[in-house]
Amino acid sequence: MGLLDIAALNRAAAELHAENPSVILYGEGWTGGSCPLPEELRAMKKNARELPDFAMFSDDLRDGVKGSVFYDTDCGYVNGKAAERAELIKSVMSGGIWREDVGRASAECWTDKPQQSVNYVEAHDNLTLYDKLRSSMPEASGAEIIAADKLAAAIVFLSQGVPFIQAGQEILRSKTAPDGSFVHDSYNSPDSVNSIKWNDVTLRRGVMEYYRGLIAVRKFFPQFRMRDAESIRKIRFETLEGGAVAADFGGLLLIVNPAAHPLRYENGRRMMVYADHITAGIRPLFIADGAVSVAPRGIILAEYR
């Protein structure tokens, strides 16, 4: 998008919405290289407030959750840098909206509308999420990598903004070359690399069902689909041990634990749990009285009274 100017894209949006008000417009809010346009004219993420009809991919959430896409072994919130990314995670869970109670500069918070933030950790380019986690967690077990994958997905689906996943992400899609290396940008790779391995639907059914459950949770609880900054700023965040984060929506509590050890959370309330590290959905899993244990690299989503 950044190779085009703001005025041109705003004109395009107006004409498209005149034809069909339901058209959704989104793109990559960067230039992808050099650009002759002055920065203030570029249709890019830093100028998103001047492009109110366009959503843009949140590389803040992407790299904050899993580490930089430009360095295979770099880690993010779910795979090794929990404490130092906790404030960023609270910010992206707020849809990138600036908040006084979150330690992130207002200049880095690029939108006032959660609808503009496309939240993702995997797309067509760069390593798949599963391959990125395997590259950055070389000592981790298979179960630990899957837990990190599911935690990353939970952040995508339960953050304010627009969730986005890549085809096959829900079955731990990998793009593996014949030599065993992971392919970053597979636009010129053969079908053996790019094809979805449908046997993984069976092999990874537990992960797929977790993604399905997260989608159901997002649809069921309007607290994850807020439409304005004023509402989002009412979410109460608490930073916990090891960079864990609790988000209190008033009657609904989300706890995110990125650490490699369990976390005990006490609020003295009766909690009806809808999601943990194994299952997510709209039917209660169990009731906790006063306290709940959050598994390593897991979540707890609970209504409380």
Per-range role (PLM):
Residues G2-D5, R85-K90, R134, R225, ...:
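A generic short-segment signal for beta-strand/edge and adjacent turn/coil regions
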Residues I145-I146, F157, V162-I165, Q169-I171, ...:
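Carbohydrate-interacting/catalytic domains
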Residues L9-A12, E39-R42, G180-F182, G268-R269:
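Short, glycine/charged-enriched secondary-structure capping and boundary segments
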Residues M1-P36:
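Active-site neighborhood of glycoside hydrolase catalytic domains
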Residues S22-L172, P178, S189, P258-A259:
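Conserved alpha/beta catalytic core and glycan-binding cleft of carbohydrate-active enzymes
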Residues N10-A14, K90, V118-V121, A153-F157, ...:
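Non-transmembrane alpha-helical segments in soluble domains
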Residues L4, A8, E144-A148, G206:
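Soluble or luminal CAZymes and related metallo-dependent hydrolases
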Residues A8, F54, S58, R227-S231:
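General structural signal for secondary-structure boundaries
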